[in-house]
Regions:
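Catalytic machinery of carbohydrate-active enzymes
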Residues: 1-261
Length: 261
């Protein structure tokens, strides 16, 4: 979401060209060297925000949740467009942006110098605090991922983006590092097989067309036209819609609820 927010930030800057833009975020490293932001504050660590930045100031405050918008719940528009609409700024097909310094690239690149061209996979996603090691709504079934690995392992060095607690695959090398080092890895890769998670947003920000596998979430809402978006087949079983959520499926759900056999 923070990476997608850089596209919204660009749209805000396009409308408010002379504004002093302050971003409050839990992921400040996403906005390093971004020319569209003047200052970054870390969410939950700064007091006096109202006194210092709002009271008596001629400003606009953008505190919106696109996940509660009608167009998101009905899956009728891309999330970036939805977010721009909520902020009352024109959406002109802005894409996420990542700004890597030369020193960052030179530091991380040697870690990914392998003996074959690099193919990056991200079969599972989700934040560190997510309790599910496998989330059927977004994660690739292990048997499918293993078939992909087997097909490419002789030609490519396969680097696996994963959390520490997620499953590993033979004939892969784990990439357990910051998202900025992952950005360098993606820049160095020749092929990418990703899911609806951080790496596909980083790839879009870097202008790297990738194959993205979609299981339960919508490529229309979360995806990018530059990618080869592959939708899952129709479920074998009827999806249980008798739940407490406002959207068709939650972003995280246990394997016991999976409608595929």
């Amino acid at each position: 979401k923070n990476i997608m927010a850089t596209a919204v930030l660009k749209a805000i800057r396009n409308k408010h060209k002379k504004a002093n833009i302050i971003v409050i975020t839990s992921h400040p490293d996403v906005f390093i060297d971004n020319p569209n932001v003047n200052k970054v504050l870390v969410h939950g660590t700064v007091s006096g925000i109202y006194k210092d930045y709002i009271a008596g100031k001629d400003n606009k405050v953008f505190i919106t949740d696109p996940y509660s918008a009608s167009d998101y719940l009905t899956e009728s528009k891309n999330l970036i467009e939805i977010w721009c609409n909520l902020c009352d700024v024109p959406y002109k097909d802005e894409l996420p942006e990542i700004f890597l310094s030369k020193s960052e690239i030179e530091y991380f690149a040697p870690f990914y110098k392998l003996d074959k061209p690099i193919m990056v996979i991200q079969p599972c996603g989700g934040p560190i605090e997510q309790p599910l090691k496998y989330n059927w709504v977004r994660d690739v079934p292990p048997v499918v991922m293993q078939d992909i690995i087997n097909a490419f392992k002789d030609e490519y060095a396969i680097v696996h983006i994963k959390r520490q607690d997620q499953m590993t695959y033979e004939n892969t090398t784990a990439a357990l590092d910051s998202w900025r080092s992952i950005a360098v890895l993606l820049m160095m890769s020749k092929r990418r097989v990703l899911i609806d998670s951080s790496a596909q947003h980083i790839a879009a920000a870097l202008g790297l067309p990738s194959m993205v596998l979609w299981i339960g979430t919508s490529s229309k809402v979360f995806g990018y036209e530059m990618h080869a978006n592959v939708d899952a087949s129709t479920p074998d079983k009827e999806i249980n819609l008798d739940h407490m959520y406002y959207q068709r499926l939650p972003l995280f759900e246990d394997i016991s609820k999976c409608p595929y056999t």
